[in-house]
Amino acid sequence: MNDKLQEEHNEKDTTSQINGFTPPHMSIDFHSNNNSNIIETIGVSKRLGNSVLSELDSRASSKFEFLKDQSEQQYNGDKNNEPKSGSYNINEFFQAKHDSQFGQMESLDTHYTLLHTPKRKSQHAIPQDRSDSMKRSRPSRSIPYTTPVVNDITRRIRRLKLRNSLVNGNDIVARARSMQANSNINSIKNTPLSKPKPFMHKPNFLMPTTNSLNKINSAHRNTSSSSTASSIPRSKVHRSTSIRDLHAKTKPVERTPVAQGTNSQLKNSVSVFDRLYKQTTFSRSTSMNNLSSGTSAKSKEHTNVKTRLVKSKTSGSLSSNLKQSTATGTKSDRPIWR
């Protein structure tokens, strides 16, 4: 029963029987000209299969022709121009090529192993075993202690050391001198250093300079010469006063003797600060009233006449004057403001 079912299945399955072969024992002949059967067995589309197979055939044919020509030339060279035998097979050429290239290839073990540089062996190198055995075979010799030979030089050096070590009178003097020198050095070291100069000096603008002193001296000379020339101070002469009145008013000024020890420059000397920062000009804030009051205060010493600055007439003052004139009854032909 099972045999019948297997036969029926084999008859229905047309794809499994190709050229009378069953699938488990299927063999494909790629060198046959019938390429359609190969494509059907593989299961690739005919268009793709034909293009791939044609490309492979063209490459194989070109490679085969190139290798065939090369093999014929090598065979002719090996035989030394002997007649070509028909028994020569191209497979031998491929095998020889393969063997030569395969022999030149590097093995995997040697390719992937780490490179170790071998140590250089010295020419006089002795094996470790031999060196140990030689050391053991040698008898151990004890090195005897040898005292140094005493010469005349060593004796003289010892004598000099003994002489220096002995305390004599000369040594005491030398030690005293050295101690004194050391004490002098220590005293020099212990002396305090001189005070450093101050970093910031005192300002010089408060001290009198040579130019200021010269100016003061010249001013003092001028004042002394003027006092000797005219002892009587000149007073302002008014036109109304007569010469007799002037003689009656002026009195002789008594001269006060100046002490010789006192210096007149100290009285007239002015500090640089006062000369630099003293205000000698009028400020802009001063008004005409202040000036008039200042001048009147000065003039009071001589005369009792009050000086007054007349203000300019304005339209308001003119109109008030007109009203007053009309009130009193005085008539004017022309107005004052004209």
From Swiss-Prot:
GO biological process: cell division; chromosome segregation
Subcellular localization(s) per the UniProt record: Cytoplasm, Cytoskeleton; Cytoplasm, Cytoskeleton, Spindle; Bud neck
Biased composition, class Low complexity, residue ranges: 216-234
Keywords associated with the record: Cell cycle, Cell division, Chromosome partition, Cytoplasm, Cytoskeleton, Mitosis, Phosphoprotein
Biased segments, Polar residues type: 72-88, 284-297, 312-330
GO annotation, cellular component aspect: cellular bud neck; cytoplasm; spindle
Region of interest: Disordered: 1-29, 67-88, 116-146, 210-263, 284-338
Modified residues (Phosphoserine): S165
A molecular function (GO) term: microtubule binding
Feature: compositional bias, Basic and acidic residues: 1-14, 242-254
Function: May have a role related to the spindle integrity function of the DAM1 complex, which is essential for proper chromosome segregation. Causes growth arrest when highly overexpressed.
Family: Belongs to the SHE1 family.
Protein name: Mitotic spindle-associated protein SHE1
Lineage summary: Eukaryota, Fungi, Dikarya, Ascomycota, Saccharomycotina
